Curated annotation (Swiss-Prot):
Name used for this protein in its record: UPF0178 protein AM1_1179
InterPro entries hit by this protein: UPF0178
Family assignment from sequence similarity: Belongs to the UPF0178 family.
Organism of derivation: Acaryochloris marina (strain MBIC 11017)
Highest rank taxon of the organism: Bacteria
Length: 152
């Protein structure tokens, strides 16, 4: 199992939680972005820079992930593609995407997109707060305890 991070929009506080988790449980973590990322030195952490362009990081992740891998993303279409490939997706606010909730999330995303295009809604979600970071860390710990077998 491996953790992939859609790193272009991933908050730094979430990346720090992921770095600590990767070293603690000895799981491979790959950050994928269309800009240079300098992760901390570790045998378990690396970064891939993809060419700039629409969905470059998303496409790289979907192309390389294996069934059972975890992807950290707030991008709902990417999460849907991950689940379709039998991976797992967790957003930076600690919500685990599943086959059961994905249709609802896609519908809500499309609705909000239409509202933004019509000028009825502006802006995005509120900034990540301490509670969000704690929810993410707790969900990540639960997920890793259930799905990851550290090397001996």
């Amino acid at each position: 199992m491996k953790i992939w991070v859609d790193a272009d929009a991933c908050p730094n506080a979430i990346k720090e939680i992921l770095y600590r988790a990767a070293r603690r449980v000895k799981i491979h973590l790959t950050l994928v972005a269309n800009q240079y990322i300098n992760p901390p030195a570790s045998d378990y952490i690396d970064a891939v820079q993809v060419p700039a362009g629409f969905d470059g990081a998303d496409n790289h992740i979907v192309e390389h992930l294996q069934a059972g891998d975890l992807v950290i993303t707030a991008d709902i279409p990417l999460a849907a593609a991950v689940i379709e490939k039998l991976g797992h997706a967790l957003n930076p606010r600690g919500e685990l995407y599943t086959q059961n909730n994905m249709r609802e999330r896609l519908s809500m995303r499309n609705f909000m997109e239409e509202m933004r295009e019509g000028g009825l809604v502006t802006g995005g979600p509120p900034a990540l707060n301490q509670r969000d970071r704690q929810l993410f860390a707790n969900q990540l710990d639960r997920f890793l305890a259930k799905h990851h077998q550290p090397p001996a």
